């Protein structure tokens, strides 16, 4: 192939290769699995001339034929060597890597790789094939060739082959790091080409899209001006603009016209063409000019992307480290080390359990908290007691007219019957028991849920150990809940005994009377309600109400504290201690350590993947540091 004429200065050329090599090396490390890398993706409809453009750039024959020829993404890595160095090729895919020295073998090697990756036939694969070409006759450039867009499935292809190809193309062109190289024949309406429509959908402003017009020799007479307008960016605007090239046609290939001869023919075509000569003179035409344009675009794109790429690697490394910490180190193979590992695991879990129930930091799950929800439950209980007291007050007021029938015994008017007082208090206390037991159940379920979440974070990947912990948590939950329920029921039985210290009751009664007097100062009926208290049933009821409110205030305050204390003591403190004792007993079963440390295969695989990601990201970080 005739050596392409480059206008790069030597100083600029010295910067090009290291810049492109940096990204190529990152891609070879597999970093593209984790981050999007700067790239140029080549897309086009079938028969757009895409393969011819790539052949002309690389100087080697690529797979040709009807239907889908490119069946896997092909990374075409071109490295410009010194004049005296021989042509060299290297193809790599999956775990296969092969060097060869004959450019004529390229097509065969690619077909073999595609058959291996996508199966023999016409299927496609998302797996990348990497082809590296080192030659004095190629530009310093890396392109990713994607399958041509098919509209109709041919024999042997699935009906949705078109959708499969578009999905594969979108995987690349949606990334902000990708420059979209759209190949469009000159002899079709550019606005209707699917490749350009796809590029516009993902890059509406055309900031990442470069148009390549092919087959200028097939343009109908009279339409040349339209082609010139397109290249001048006057029809469909793209920020990166357009280039136009003429590659070998099918007849020239059949006539065995070499790529050397095709390059000379292309140059002559544009120089002599009455309409396209202007494009040649302006630097918008020929493969060598396209190569220069692409190299400059890629280098600038890489230079703009590198700072952001470094930040992304830092972020991804931090995320990976955090995930690895969540999965732990995995059990060692040495028996003594396995036992130590097991002891550490169980001990850490029990310590975290105690920390969780005392409000301290939980190491294995820093965001796991129990007290916010617990305080919410207890606050709701306190609020319920207040609202229940208000309902109690309304209930007494509503029953004023029925007092004589319901509550008054043989006493004369003006006397307060203590049994009546006790009866009303007991009736009210009974109404509070079921809500308290409901709160107990809510807290018990919540504590169990938190303990299980803690076990899951502590024993990630160890299903047997996790199952043992869950079983113990459930058993302890039932035991402590049953005990707490018994204590609460006993508490409410005791509440049926109306009792408090005399001084406590006197103070409460005094506060209630003072509040009553303040509330009634502005009431018109105040005088009639307070005169003749010894002979007025309403005054007696008012006095009864005062005593009931005073006592309920004391009892509700007692329950507001006592019920949460019982629940917290048994369901948190005692449950955590019992779980600690029960889990530590496992340490005595040294023969069962191997079974309990049997790791979930998926977790082990995930850890390996994370370690692999961490390794390649660290290599990538070092690579960028030396750029």
UniProtKB/Swiss-Prot annotation:
Q: Which CDD domains match?
A: DLP_1
**Positions of the GED domain:** 541-627
What processes does the entry annotate via GO biological process terms? defense response to virus; receptor internalization; response to virus; synaptic vesicle budding from presynaptic endocytic zone membrane
* Annotated stretches, region: G5 motif: 246-249
- Induction, per UniProt: By interferons.
Q: Where is this region: G4 motif?
A: 214-217
UniProt-annotated stretches for the region G2 motif:
69-71
Database matches in InterPro entries: Dynamin, Dynamin_GTPase, Dynamin_GTPase_CS, Dynamin_N, Dynamin_stalk, G_DYNAMIN_dom, GED, GED_dom
Region of interest (G3 motif), ranges: 145-148
Specify the domain of life of the species encoding this protein. Answer: Eukaryota
Please list the disulfide bridges.
none
Intracellular or extracellular location(s): Cytoplasm
Q: Which GO terms describe its cellular component?
A: cytoplasm; microtubule; nucleus; plasma membrane; presynapse; synapse
> Record's SMART domains?
DYNc, GED
The region called G1 motif is annotated at 44-51
Example GO molecular function term? microtubule binding
Q: What is its main location?
A: cytoplasm
Stated family: Belongs to the TRAFAC class dynamin-like GTPase superfamily. Dynamin/Fzo/YdjA family.
The protein depicted here goes by the name Interferon-induced GTP-binding protein MxB
Q: Which organism is it from?
A: Danio rerio (Zebrafish)
- Taxonomic lineage: Eukaryota, Metazoa, Chordata, Craniata, Vertebrata
């Amino acid at each position: 192939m005739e050596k392409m004429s480059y206008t790069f200065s030597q100083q600029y050329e010295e910067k090009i290769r290291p810049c492109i090599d940096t990204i190529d090396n990152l891609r070879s490390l597999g970093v593209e699995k984790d981050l999007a890398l700067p790239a140029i993706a080549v897309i086009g409809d079938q028969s757009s001339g895409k393969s011819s453009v790539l052949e002309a750039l690389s100087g080697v024959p690529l797979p040709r034929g009807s239907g889908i020829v490119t069946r896997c993404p092909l990374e075409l890595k071109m490295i410009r060597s010194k004049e005296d160095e021989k042509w060299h090729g290297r193809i790599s895919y999956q775990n296969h890597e092969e060097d060869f020295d004959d450019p004529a073998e390229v097509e065969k090697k690619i077909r073999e790789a595609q058959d291996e990756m996508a199966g023999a036939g016409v299927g496609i694969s998302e797996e990348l094939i990497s082809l590296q070409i080192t030659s004095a006759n190629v530009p310093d450039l890396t392109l990713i060739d994607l399958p041509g867009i098919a509209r109709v499935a041919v024999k042997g292809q699935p009906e949705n082959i078109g959708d499969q190809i578009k999905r594969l193309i979108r995987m690349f062109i949606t990334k902000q790091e990708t420059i979209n190289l759209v190949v469009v024949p000159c002899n079709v309406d550019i606005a209707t080409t699917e490749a350009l429509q796809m590029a516009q959908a993902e890059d509406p402003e055309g900031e990442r899209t470069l148009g390549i017009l092919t087959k200028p020799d097939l343009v109908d007479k009279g339409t040349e001006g339209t082609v010139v307008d397109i290249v001048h960016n006057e029809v469909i605007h793209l920020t990166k603009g357009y280039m136009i090239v003429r590659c070998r046609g099918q007849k020239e290939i059949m006539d065995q016209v070499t790529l050397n001869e095709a390059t000379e023919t292309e140059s002559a075509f544009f120089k002599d063409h009455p309409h396209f000569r202007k494009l040649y003179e302006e630097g918008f035409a020929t493969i060598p000019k396209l190569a220069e344009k692409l190299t400059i675009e890629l280098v600038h794109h890489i230079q703009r992307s590198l700072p952001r790429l470094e930040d992304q690697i830092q972020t991804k490394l931090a995320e990976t480290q955090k995930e690895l910490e969540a999965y732990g180190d995995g059990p060692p193979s040495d028996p003594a080390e396995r036992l130590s590992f097991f002891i550490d695991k169980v001990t850490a879990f029990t310590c975290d359990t105690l920390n969780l129930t005392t409000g301290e930091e939980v190491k294995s799950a820093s965001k796991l908290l129990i007290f916010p929800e617990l305080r919410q439950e207890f606050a709701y209980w306190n609020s319920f007691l207040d609202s229940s007291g208000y309902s109690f007050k309304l209930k007494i007021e509503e029953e004023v007219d029925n007092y004589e029938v319901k509550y008054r015994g043989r006493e004369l008017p003006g006397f307060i019957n203590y049994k009546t007082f006790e009866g009303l208090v007991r009736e009210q206390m009974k109404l509070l028991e079921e809500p308290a037991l409901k709160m107990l159940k809510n807290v018990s379920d919540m504590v169990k849920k938190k303990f299980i979440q803690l076990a899951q974070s502590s024993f990630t990947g160890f299903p047997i150990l996790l199952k043992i912990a869950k079983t113990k948590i459930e058993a302890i939950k039932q035991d402590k809940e049953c005990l707490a329920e018994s204590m609460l029921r006993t508490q409410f039985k005791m509440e049926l005994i109306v009792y408090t210290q005399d001084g406590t009751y006197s103070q409460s009664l005094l506060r209630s009377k003072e509040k009553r007097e303040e509330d009634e100062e502005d009431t018109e009926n105040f005088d009639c309600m307070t005169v003749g208290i010894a002979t007025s049933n309403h005054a007696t009821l008012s006095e009864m109400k005062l005593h009931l409110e005073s006592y309920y205030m004391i009892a509700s305050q007692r329950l507001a504290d006592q019920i949460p204390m019982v629940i917290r003591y048994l369901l948190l403190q005692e449950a955590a201690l019992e779980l600690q004792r029960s889990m530590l007993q496992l340490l005595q079963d040294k023969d069962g350590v191997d079974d309990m440390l049997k790791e979930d295969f998926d977790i082990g695989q995930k850890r390996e993947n994370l370690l692999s990601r961490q390794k390649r990201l660290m290599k990538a970080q070092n690579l960028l540091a030396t750029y």
